[in-house]
Swiss-Prot record:
Record's keyword annotation contains Disulfide bond: yes
UniProt KW keywords: Cell wall, Disulfide bond, Fruiting body, Secreted, Signal
Family designation: Belongs to the fungal hydrophobin family.
Coiled-coil annotated spans: none
Signal peptide start and end residues: 1-24
UniProt source species: Schizophyllum commune (Split gill fungus)
Protein name per Swiss-Prot or TrEMBL: Class I hydrophobin SC3
Encoding gene per record: SC3
Subunit details: Self-assembles to form functional amyloid fibrils called rodlets. Self-assembly into fibrillar rodlets occurs spontaneously at hydrophobic:hydrophilic interfaces and the rodlets further associate laterally to form amphipathic monolayers. Schizophyllan stabilizes small hydrophobin multimers in aqueous solutionand is necessary for subsequent hydrophobin assembly into films on hydrophilic surfaces.
A GO term for molecular function: structural constituent of cell wall
Xref: InterPro entries: Hydrophobin, Hydrophobin_CS
PROSITE patterns membership: HYDROPHOBIN
Primary location group: secreted
Knocked-out gene: effects: Leads to a wettable phenotype with hydrophilic aerial hyphae. Reduces the surface tension, therefore decreasing the formation of aerial hyphae and primordia. Affects the composition of the cell wall with an increase of the amount of mucilage (i.e., water-soluble (1-3)beta-glucan with single glucose residues attached by (1-6)beta-linkages), and a decrease of the amount of alkali-resistant glucan (linked to chitin).
Cellular component aspect of the GO annotation: extracellular region; fungal-type cell wall
Length: 136
């Protein structure tokens, strides 16, 4: 009876080794590449109309630190980093914008460029389809 005990331990050792090799948590043979998400924004030609008193009728009134063409180098770099693809590069893009209310439209409401924008992305970091306006 005791002569078979080493054989039983040998089988148990081999079975345990096979079980450990089959368990997850080891080093995988292949890695999965990260998933890339692309956001495509299509903006029609600017149709924003400005009513008397500096209010937008088709977008939101914003105060932007910079307003540049979507084809400019800084804007294309920022759009690329954020994964935004524009179908039309002939639109104006507002950078680092904050919304303006009717109360904030007065003289000291915006010390940069006041614009009316159709699309706001990333909480005002990028506003797409902007039209500069002058508030009197």
């Amino acid at each position: 009876m005791f002569a078979r005990l080493p054989v039983v331990f040998l089988y148990a050792f081999v079975a345990f080794g096979a079980l450990v090799a089959a368990l997850p948590g080891g080093h995988p043979g292949t890695t999965t590449p990260p998933v890339t998400t692309t956001v495509t924004v299509t903006t029609p030609p600017s149709t924003t109309t400005i009513a008397a008193g500096g209010t937008c009728t088709t977008g939101s009134l914003s105060c932007c630190n910079q307003v540049q063409s979507a084809s400019s180098s800084p804007v294309t770099a920022l759009l690329g980093l954020l994964g935004i693809v524009l179908s039309d590069l002939n639109v104006l893009v507002g950078i680092s914008c904050s919304p303006l209310t009717v109360i904030g439209v007065g003289g000291s409401g915006c010390s940069a460029q006041t614009v009316c924008c159709e699309n706001t992305q990333f909480n005002g970091l990028i506003n797409i389809g902007c039209t500069p306006i002058n508030i009197l």
